[in-house]
Amino acid sequence: FLNFNKLKNNLEAIPEKSDVIIDFSLCGFVDHSVMENVDDYQELFYKKGGNIEVIGLDVLGADSKHPFALRRLLPIHKILPDNKTKRQNNLSLIAENFDLAYQSTKSVDCLFLENFIYFKTKKIEHIFNELTEKSGRFRSFDVTFSEGEFIAKEVVRTTMLFIKTAKSAPAFTLDKEGLLERLYALAGYEDIDIESHKDFSNRFYLRGENPKEIRSFFTNELVRFFESNAYYHIESNKDGILISNKERIASIKEVKALLDFGIRLNNAINETSNEAISH
C-alpha cells in the first residue's frame, strides 16, 4: 500500500486508451486496498478503450477466496488449491481454446531445460502455469530461476515455450538484441551470416556450432518467416527449441501470441524439412 502512490502516479500519466501490464511478481505482498484500486483503474481504462492486465499474483498466495484478498508469499501448504488468479483462470480458457492441458501448480520437472545454454549460468527452481499439448510436443510455462549468489542473487520469473520438433534441428541461437552474445560465444557458437539474405543477417544475431548445417536449415521460407513475424529469442539444441521474449511473466495476450508463433514456426520447420527431403 505504501508504494501505491507511485503506481497511481504512473497510471495517471498513461493515456487511458493504452494497453498496460502491472507486474506484482517481485512484491512480498499486495493488500486488499491496492487490489481494489487497481480494479477501479482497470474499469476506467476499459471504458476508455484501453486495458490493464495484472500479472505476477500467481506467485503469491491468499488465505481467502475474496477477489480482493491480500496476497503474500505463503508456505505451499497454506495456499488454497482452488484460489486461482484472474490470469490463471484465463490460462484455463486458453487451454480449452488450444486443446491443451493446464497445470497451475509448481513442478520441479525441469530436466528438459538443463541442456539449453541460456540456463548454463542460472539455477532453475521450478516451472508453473504449464500449458501442454496432449502429445507433449508443446509446453508453455512460467519458470522461476536465479542468477548469482548471496547478495548478488537475482530471482527472475519469465514465460517460455518449448517445442519438441518432429524433425531434428541444428544447435543455434537467434537473437535480435545481441544481449546474450557473450554467453553463446563462450559456448563456442560462431556468428553466422546467411549470404543470400543480407538484411536478415544485419537484423538478427545468428550463432551456432555448425555453420554449414545451420545455413542449410535456414531456407528462404524460414528466413522470411522470421523476418515477417514478431521478435523472440530462440535457442535450438538436440532436445528441441526454446522460445522466450521478455524476462518477466507474460500477459494473457502475450501467451496467446507465443503459442501461435510456436505452432506456426513448427509448421514452417516441418514444411522446409519435407521440401529438403523431396529435393
Feature map (PLM): residue ranges:
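Charged, low-complexity intrinsically disordered regions
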Residues: K84-H279
